[in-house]
Amino acid sequence: MSRSDFQPGAASGRHTHPGEELGYVLEGTLELTIEGKAPQRLKAGDVIFMPAGAVHEAKNVGTGTLRVVSTYVLEVGKPLATPVK
């Protein structure tokens, strides 16, 4: 499990996870872009499900800090995330 904090305008960069991700927006406004889909705008209380291998990016589009808590289903020894150009 991890918590990520993003300042206004900050983004995660495009990346993938080798396993599923389940996230929860604690605070702020998140723009979630999943490759091949229209961007989604999420707010505090919203839940994120990311399938394994999906290319995605999270960006803080609000005026305050964005806080997201996530848990991942990964095989032992696999990296948490892999950047995508």
Regions found by a protein language model. Name each.
Residues 14, 32-33, 56-62:
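Short beta-strand His + acidic residue motifs that chelate non-heme Fe in jelly-roll/DSBH
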Residues 12-19, 54:
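Histidine-centered catalytic micro-motifs
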Residues 14, 23-24, 49-50, 70:
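Structural recognition of the beta-strand scaffold that forms the well-ordered cores
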Residues 4, 59-85:
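Double-stranded beta-helix
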Residues 6-7, 30, 36-53:
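Short acidic-glycine-tyrosine-enriched beta hairpin
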Residues 6, 17-32:
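Short, conserved beta-strand element in jelly-roll/cupin
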Residues 3, 13, 22, 38-40:
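Short, surface-exposed secondary-structure edge patches
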Residues 1-14, 71:
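A short glycine-rich, His/Asp/Glu-containing loop-to-beta-strand
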